[in-house]
């Protein structure tokens, strides 16, 4: 067995089933130990990630600084001893090291990463897992942990994170605590329509017996973290202050979740290679006489891209956005990651939900300080809403936002129970004030989700996403297919600019920026069809036999109205009936030829 295979096998055998946040893909400014500033970009996800400078040179961020990377003959990435600088400021030594990152070595690195990525991302049912209750006010233990070599930056972390997790309103304690739109509890209160208001008991801070590197590993490209040991050590340090059984919310003898907020930054948002990547892991660990099913973790701090102080230096002491916590906490409730986890599925557009879901890139909306609330599918899975099914032609349906007392609608595939379209109203106010677009948003669901399983990966099959958006403008650009802000590629072949990406999101709802007032088969909008298996067992599509027409949005009230049409043979004008008006439509079509 060669060395690469041995390393891969070791990682996969020791890794716990874990589900994590996407990599933060905006530019990150690092302060180097020599006083210089370096802008970097993070790529990939927990199982395979890398960091680059503006010209694509690979670097490794560590506790001691960010260094030019080396790639060895086994495709492993490691820091050199040479500190990295902006391309125009590089020394001759840096230039030589950058030149050694040849295309064959980069290809080997990504091939190695794809092997680990593929193994780590196979869907799995986590037998015996107990998810948090979806209603009421379950109690959750949150432990604040410092490392032997890193303390908290926030002066009073108990005060700050108790507010961050539980408060109705937020105020600034000098670490931008008020920068978050809502506390975590308030986020779920709003998302659930008042049906779910978790209570977080914050204890600590305690100092772990080992260093950051001991728990976070040292790999610059793969998952080598020890969240199980992190959680065990944290619980043992507070066991005299708490009764673990208080956090068994359904009385089955198992604590559903213990959450750790650790000092410093997280690797998912540009933290050093030794730091933890935000995640929830199924551990099924017995501590004392009580089992804990899941450990979760995220970082204390976040450094927003592009935001600088009055001296021009990046802010480095922002409290973390609630988006990361809400994403990981949602895993502990059973929701899966909805972003694509394979190289093939990242190379295509119209594959996912991007900013339209907390389980995709919506966790980083406004840098994570204004995460996307639960959408119609997520609410229905949690049992917070039962969408009203449309079965016959209905005119003048009024759609209001869920947070304002509205409801969503459902169109079901009579041939396949798990396939539906969901319809809701998104308005740029309240919890959705930071949304990219507004109007009627349509989701295509082809996923047997009557029971939750955080071990699924619904959007990993390129060309057949299971949970996605039907984009009014005909294009939902994948974030993996966008160029970075400096114009360079993310590594998946895409050429969309950041401006095009934002415009694509704004154009997803109806009528949207494109003024699209109908959704019919004739428009050939991606994802507006049903899936079936052809005679060869391959995916094929067929028309839905329904249409949404006369979609209008009242710009003052935000109400959306539309007609639901069950199509009939001869109903050429799609008004829900066959009559002489269809003859006029036919004549118009002929004359237009």
Task: Walk through the language-model features, giving the residues of each.
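N-terminal signal peptide c-region/cleavage motif recognized by signal peptidases
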Residues: 15-17
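N-terminal prosegments of processed precursors
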Residues: 19-129
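Active-site-proximal segments of metallohydrolase catalytic domains
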Residues: 123-134, 177-292
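Non-catalytic C-terminal accessory/binding modules of secreted extracellular proteins
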Residues: 153-154, 163, 170-190, 194-195, ...
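A domain-level signal for the mature, folded cores of soluble proteins
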Residues: 210-225, 310-319, 332, 336-414
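Acidic carboxylate motifs that coordinate Ca2+ or other divalent cations, activating on Asp/Glu
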Residues: 248-252, 327, 573-575, 579
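Alpha-helical segments with a strong preference for the paired helices of cellulosomal dockerin domains
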Residues: 258, 572-593
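Active-site recognition of the HExxH zinc-binding catalytic motif
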Residues: 323-338, 423
């Amino acid at each position: 067995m060669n060395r690469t295979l041995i390393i891969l096998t070791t990682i996969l055998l020791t890794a716990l089933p874990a589900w994590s946040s996407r990599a933060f893909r905006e530019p990150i400014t690092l302060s180097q130990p020599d006083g210089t500033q370096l802008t970097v970009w993070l790529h990939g996800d927990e199982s395979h990630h890398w960091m680059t400078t503006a010209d694509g040179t690979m670097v490794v961020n560590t506790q001691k600084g960010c260094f030019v990377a080396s790639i060895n003959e086994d495709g492993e990435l490691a820091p050199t001893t040479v500190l990295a600088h902006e391309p125009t400021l590089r020394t001759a030594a840096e230039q030589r090291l950058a030149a050694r990152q040849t295309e064959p070595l980069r290809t080997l690195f990504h091939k190695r990463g794809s092997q680990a990525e593929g193994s780590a991302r196979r869907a799995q049912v986590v037998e015996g897992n107990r998810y948090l209750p979806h209603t009421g006010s379950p109690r959750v233990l949150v432990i604040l942990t410092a490392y032997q070599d890193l303390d908290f930056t926030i002066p009073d972390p108990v005060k700050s994170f108790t507010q961050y997790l539980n408060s109705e309103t937020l105020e600034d304690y000098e670490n931008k605590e008020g920068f978050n739109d809502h506390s975590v509890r308030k986020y779920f209160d709003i998302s659930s329509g008042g049906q779910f208001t978790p209570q977080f008991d914050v204890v600590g801070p305690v100092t772990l017996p080992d260093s950051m590197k001991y728990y976070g590993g040292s790999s610059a490209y793969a998952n080598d973290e020890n969240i199980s040991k992190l959680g065990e050590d944290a619980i043992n340090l507070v066991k005299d202050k708490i009764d673990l059984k208080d956090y068994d919310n359904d009385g089955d003898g198992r604590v559903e979740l213990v959450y750790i907020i650790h000092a410093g930054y997280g690797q998912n948002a540009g933290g050093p290679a030794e730091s933890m990547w935000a995640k929830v892991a199924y551990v099924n660990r017995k501590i004392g006489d009580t089992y804990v099913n899941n450990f979760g973790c995220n970082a204390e701090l976040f450094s927003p891209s592009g935001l600088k102080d009055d001296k021009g230096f990046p802010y480095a002491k922002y409290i973390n956005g609630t988006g990361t916590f809400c994403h990981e906490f949602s895993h502990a409730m059973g929701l899966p990651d909805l972003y694509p986890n394979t190289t093939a599925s990242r190379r295509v557009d119209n594959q996912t939900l991007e900013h339209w879901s907390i389980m995709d890139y919506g966790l980083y909306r406004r840098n994570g300080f204004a995460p996307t609330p639960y959408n119609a599918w997520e609410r229905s899975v949690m049992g917070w809403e039962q969408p009203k099914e449309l079965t016959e032609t209905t005119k003048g349906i009024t759609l209001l936002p869920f947070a304002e007392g509205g409801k969503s609608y459902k169109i079901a595939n009579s041939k396949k129970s798990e396939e539906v379209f969901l319809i809701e109203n998104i308005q740029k106010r309240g919890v959705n004030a930071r949304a990219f677009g507004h109007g009627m948003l349509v989701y295509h669901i082809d996923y047997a989700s009557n029971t939750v399983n955080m071990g699924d990966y619904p959007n990993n099959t390129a060309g057949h996403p299971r949970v996605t958006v039907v984009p009014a403008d005909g294009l939902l650009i994948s974030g993996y297919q966008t160029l970075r802000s400096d114009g360079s590629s993310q590594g998946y072949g895409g050429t969309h600019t950041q401006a095009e990406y934002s415009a694509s999101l704004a154009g997803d709802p109806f009528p949207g920026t494109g003024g699209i007032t109908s959704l019919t088969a004739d428009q050939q909008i991606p994802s507006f069809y049903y899936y079936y298996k052809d005679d060869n067992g391959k995916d094929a599509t067929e028309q839905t036999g329904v249409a949404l027409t006369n979609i209008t949005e009242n710009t003052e009230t935000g109400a959306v109205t539309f007609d639901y049409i069950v199509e009939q043979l001869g109903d050429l004008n799609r008004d829900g009936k066959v009559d002489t008006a269809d003859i006029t439509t036919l004549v118009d079509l002929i004359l237009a030829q």
